[in-house]
Amino acid sequence: MRIRTGQILSAVTLWALTGVITSTLPAISIAQSPAKVDSRFEAARSAIRQAMEEKQIPSVSVAVAKDGKIIWEESFGWADREKMIRATPDTLYSLASISKPFTATALMRLVQQGKIDLDKPANDYLGAVKLTGLAGDASAATVRRVLSHTAGLPYHYHFFYNNEADGPPGMDESIAHYGLVVTPPGEAWEYSNLGYGIIDYIIARTSGRDYADYMRTEVFVPLGLTHTSVDIGPGLESYAAQRYDAQQRPIPFYTFDHRGGSAIYASAHDLVRFGMFHLKDHLQYQQAILKDSTLDQMHQSATPPVPSQPGLGYGLGWITKADDHGYSAVYHTGGMPGVSTALALFPSEDLAVVVLTNSYAGITPKMMQAIVGCVLPKYADAVRNDKEQNPPKPGPFTPNPQLLGAWTGTVRTWKDKMTFSIVFQQDADIHVKLGEQLETLVNDASFRDGALEGRFVSSITTPDVNRYGHTLLLHLRLRGDKLTGQVIAETPDDSVHYALASYAELIRKTDAK
């Protein structure tokens, strides 16, 4: 199951991999409760317990800070069911995409020091291997645009498991193969984990230090985050929550070629204090590693409007929402095998809320809403009103008249080019043919915010993609008599390994009837 926020490239949320589990695991259990919990949170505690039981979630850790003070921290369930280790507020959870605000914070330190200019091309800070401009000029893919997912980089994730032979390629290889400008820079917000792999590479190259070491000494330690690290740092192994799949099986440890977008672990206690720093609630022992004006800049949307999602944007490492049930919010979520996380900031209310889990069950947003509603009654009322309205479900795909007919072109992989054709019929069927493979139909088609999306059965023939079974995902934009964008090879939910993009360009066949 894949959850998208609007556009297919706006969010990445993944399900889990297979593993091994014994038949004598402890049942879901609530970790030792604090001596006293603010009575406002009883409804949220009940909602968490119910969700854990219904979805068989091994553990949940939460934290809330209001007006510069932590007012609730609690953990429920098992950090490691096999070892019978209970979760606590100091348990390290894999954060997935909440890694991005941390990485952006580190990058902004270098900006403040005058070592990086946000408005210079990202290529200026790379080595011999550069981003390749295909749909637009690579020099327009600035550092600011990479941070805000508007550089035109492709949809991308690439997982490497410890129980498998393959390991992550070097960043130069990933950039050579997938560092493609597939949308004109600045045109649209299209989420790219690869972009944050490039950011962590820029941090390492500019600072002259390994990304993980730079994060530790320049962000985690100055902010007093003792239970936060890139991957699981030395001495923190016993604190780390095991990641579990949907069948409650432990998932082997994995890493990526986009560490800056996905590789950070943190406890609920540390993460809420990171949120407090971004709310300018600087704790006595925390160093002011960024100016308040820099924090403000990070929290301002830097993306073009998304017509289907008014008020939604992306700043420098943070998602921004002008109206989240009556309040302006700055937040990030994370989802990947065995991970579902959320960190939300409500600056006008000086409120930070954290929800961390060690499985993916798709209910973290509901937990977050329940907790925020306990603190902000008007927010809770607005959430209830939304549920009562029951917005209509999207109707079946209807082809845009501008798409009707036949289109022909190529898909450019890092290895070669393949012929590619699409025919849009009046009955809404979409026929595609890639290379010499059989013609097939596109499923789950949609056309929204100027982008055509859908999925079809065919194959990309590069060696890295050929390792696992996959289907192909379309993400194309209509530009006059051209369709340009991405064809993305993506592995299935029960074997999450990659989403790897190739550039596609087609022109309308003038002789089509």
Positions of PLM-derived features:
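Short, gly/Ser/Thr-rich active-site loops of penicillin-recognizing serine hydrolases
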Residues: 356-419, 490-493, 498-513
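Short, conserved catalytic-motif segment at the N-terminal edge
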Residues: 35-95, 115-117, 131-132, 168, ...
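Active-site SXXK
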Residues: 42-48, 62, 68, 92-122, ...
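Short, well-ordered beta-strand elements
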Residues: 342-345, 349-359
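Bacterial N-terminal signal peptides
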Residues: 10-26
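Short, glycine/proline-biased beta-turn/loop segments that scaffold the active-site neighborhood
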Residues: 118-134, 223
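Central antiparallel beta-sheet cores of small beta-barrel/beta-sandwich binding domains
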Residues: 408-473, 498
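Short, surface-exposed loop or secondary-structure junction motifs
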Residues: 76, 80, 134-337, 341-342
